[in-house]
């Protein structure tokens, strides 16, 4: 009876525990869904080809997969024999471990590695075996090589670009004869792993605290010493510890999935810092402001003596010193200098088009200046045609006035000779007709001149505004300022998403720690 009571009590306790933990598990599941949604929106915000997208994809993978592959990509910096040998040397060093004989399969695969990536997996995993892409150039090795289950090293030939490979790698190493640069492994620090091959690098290692010596040659030497003398394990152990290779091995095996996720997200926060975007925006604004100030200063030199023009121009740009566009005016073509003197300084206020065009050459758009000059040439041609068209009614009115004066003169002569008027009366009639004709001509000329200059001024101002708009719109300064402002707004939105995701991560970790069996919960949910 006592045994029956104990069993009944155990069932009751288990039932109460299940009923009490069920809502908690549901909370954790909901938090996981929210996290995945936030990460999905982050992936849509960032550029598809940027490393940030790869990292966001990795975070989503870490939260959605229960069995995670540790993947490391090794790639030569160039196709030189030294860099390729460097990759092979590092691969052999990664595979070096106590009491492990040299793998003939690995040696054959490394020697015959061609254009395709070489995959080296540790341990047996059904995921590897089911994947068709690993049917070729894939090597399975025992899991006790690095004492890490589910580890995979990818040997990439130079120039290999495979987003699928890199998207699922925890670390990617660009290998050269003198250094091994780790682009994404420990996301809290930016470490550069240097091979102890070049003696010149010792001074660099002393001054830079962020550089970790790997000494893969020492690791290989220790392994070779152990193979030559299997009984002298102490010698191997000393050389292995001196090589510092165990530290690299430890860094490649993160502790927990949640820690990896937090590292990813914290690294994203550092990557999407608003500091760079704000600096770009301020720099672009300063460039644009200095551009406008230089134009205003330039306009003050329109009435200078033409003989002193080149000297003052050189002095102006030398004192201004920011853009240094006309630091050597003698390098300008003679036709351009003459055009500046004759057309723009003497006859027109549109010398600003030259400055706008030249300033735009400070950017990448070299055709901007030519386009501005084409626009100005088109405007000059249209202005000349406008003058011709405006002169047509004046010519007609002048012809009418001349005809009116002629008729008056003929009438006065007719009256004098036929009607025997006095010469005084005839001259009076002629004078009256002439005065009326001149008055008509003068009034029409004034109205025409007023209307013509008004139209010409409006047309000139309209063209200048359009020219400035076109040149500024094509200018790299304007584009840079606009891009920086958009980038700042975009990064601000990403930072808000990241902050929200990190808050969800903290809550997720907190709720997971409250469960009865955190390990089981993580295994179930992750």
From Swiss-Prot:
UniProt entry keywords in alphabetical sequence: Chromosome partition, Meiosis, Membrane, Mitochondrion, Sporulation, Transit peptide, Transmembrane, Transmembrane helix
Keyword Flavoprotein carried by entry: no
Record carries keyword Metal-binding: no
Pfam name, any one: Mmc1_C
GO cellular component, one term: matrix side of mitochondrial inner membrane
GO biological process terms on file: chromosome segregation; cristae formation; meiotic cell cycle; sporulation resulting in formation of a cellular spore
Membrane topology type: Multi-pass membrane protein
Role played: Required for correct meiotic chromosome segregation. Appears to also have role in sporulation.
Name of the protein this chain belongs to: Meiotically up-regulated gene 99 protein, mitochondrial
